[in-house]
Amino acid sequence: MAKIIGIDLGTTNSCVAVMEGDKPKVIENSEGHRTTPSIVAFTDDNEILVGQSAKRQSVTNPEKTLFAIKRLIGRRFDDPIVQKDIKMVPYKIMKADNGDAWVRVKDQDKAPPQISAEVLRKMKKTAEDYLGEEVKEAVITVPAYFNDSQRQATKDAGRIAGLEVKRIINEPTAAALAYGMDKKRGDSVIAVYDLGGGTFDISIIEIAEVDGEHQFEVLATNGDTFLGGEDFDLALIEYLASEFKKDTGIDLHNDPLALQRLKEAAEKAKIELSSAQQTDVNLPYITADASGPKHLNIKLTRAKLESLVEKLVERTIEPCKTALKDAGLTVSQINEVILVGGQTRMPLVQKTVEEFFGKEPRKDVNPDEAVAVGAAIQAAVLSGEVKDILLLDVTPLSLGIETMGGVMTKLIEKNTTIPTKATQVFSTADDNQTAVTVHVLQGEREQASANKSLGRFDLRDIPPAPRGVPQIEVTFDIDANGILNVSAKDKATGKAQSIVIKASSGLSEEEVAAMVKDAQSHAEEDKKFKEMAELRNQADSLIHSCEKSMKDLADELSEDEKKGIETAISELKEAVQGTDKARIEDKLKVLTDASAKMAERIYAKKSSEGQAAQGQTQSQESTKPAEEGVVDAEFEEVKEEDKK
């Protein structure tokens, strides 16, 4: 049975894991790392780079290197949070036709799910390389405080990447699964404090034994979907830029290249200051003016960094208080505190959490990998590999509809366990009204316009009647992914209308299908690119080997043999410069055949040399000369085998 993988699609880094027997395994990517930067770059020669390779070239290609795209997913362009981000990133964020925030790269407009899909494709490929089989299904994690639009957009990203998303689960819940799966059985209440690259979540989770099952029940969740390590970096970037401006009068915000270098340096300094008390931010030739090049060199202490980000850390405490209140618990009733997300490595964050909860957070959970591990466990539950775990998650925000006077009437309160269903009967506001618009909202405000609009639809052909007489039954149904279906029915006629809530923006089915097709064509291009690269490498190796062998056997080859091999080398060199795969393969075979006799001769020569060396020990006789000969001969043979 094909594996379902678990993916932590992070703002800064992503991670993939799978269950092997009863143990989750975090899979290393092709570069040998257990996490992959969530960065996608578009190069001038139409190559798409993902992860470390994209990060490495970001300084020289800032406008076409996209990072922290998760902060834009499912968001409107006019959102104040997006407007703030526009000023901070070197790439271009623009308004799509549907009002969403998209990005513009190389004169093409791309939706955030399209960019996230590239990261997911890399995660999918990482898992496939490890498992040795195709992967089609995944569990993907999202911040607990993601709204419906953001969850839908994440599911779309999965589809574009060629994955069927079996379940969307909340990051803190996944971390709790990773923590609680192998812990001693028994009841406990844990707080998962998740401060990642772009989002913050706090979840209060009860782990209990119920009828032999290990039950994970989320009691309450809260958070901020625009607070994370990226904001800590930005605070430091602002400080460094303002210090530089004080010294030189030059504003680095106007220079994308300098801004990208500053971002890298800020991230590095922040990480260093988690273990050191001070560090130097040293960026030579960061910019230049009429008087010549300018260098940035600033000493930074841990205390200074903490003063810059103190307010950001404090912002995490209010959601913690709200989550505890919603769960009906006090701080003293929390048994364990778990830290998730790379930003929780900062000593100030750990100290603040310890002071609030009155206990030291656990250190036995890997903050970078716990979420992916939890996703893999949930994937194993869905595939039936793991039997005795039950996960009860909640909806993070209240859901309702707009009623008379612009008021939001809630049908499902926040922190309701999902899946869930709620029905309420409404009526018309005017006499002889024949249609009603159902405006679906998500949020906690009484005023409808202050909440997030998820979508609207009309129920028509209601028989004319005095206001208040028709009975319109509205049903909200949330699935296990936290995604909403809404239906409305006129009880008198039985006429009904229903929709799976697609945000008033969001991607249409046609757009997603087009993006899936586009991603598939890229995958085909990538495959061809890789095959050509491997073929060229094979050709270069054979050319080098043959040229070396010809020098060694210069006196033993006939003129015809030399000429034949030289011609074959020359033709292969010429073929490698082109893009005709069949021609390269053909010329590779010609040279392989031509050099086969030469390889036999080298082998025979080396063997006879080895036997002739009488003054050496037996081991010396058989080691060095023979070994060299074997390597060369084997190398040639392998090439021939490859051709066959």
From Swiss-Prot:
Question: Gene symbol?
Answer: dnaK
Query: What does the record say about induction?
Result: By stress conditions e.g. heat shock.
Q: Which HAMAP family match?
A: DnaK
Name it: Chaperone protein DnaK
Extent of Acidic residues compositional bias: 629-644
Write down which residues bear the modification named Phosphothreonine: T199
List all Polar residues biased stretches.
609-623
Q: Which Pfam families match?
A: HSP70
Per its record, what are the GO molecular function terms? Answer: ATP binding; ATP-dependent protein folding chaperone; unfolded protein binding
User: What is the documented function of this protein?
Assistant: Acts as a chaperone.
Q: Report the domain of life of the source organism.
A: Bacteria
UniProt keywords, alphabetically: ATP-binding, Chaperone, Nucleotide-binding, Phosphoprotein, Stress response
Signal peptide annotation: none
Keyword Mitochondrion present in the record's keywords: the answer is no
Q: Which family does it belong to?
A: Belongs to the heat shock protein 70 family.
Q: Where is this region: Disordered?
A: 603-644
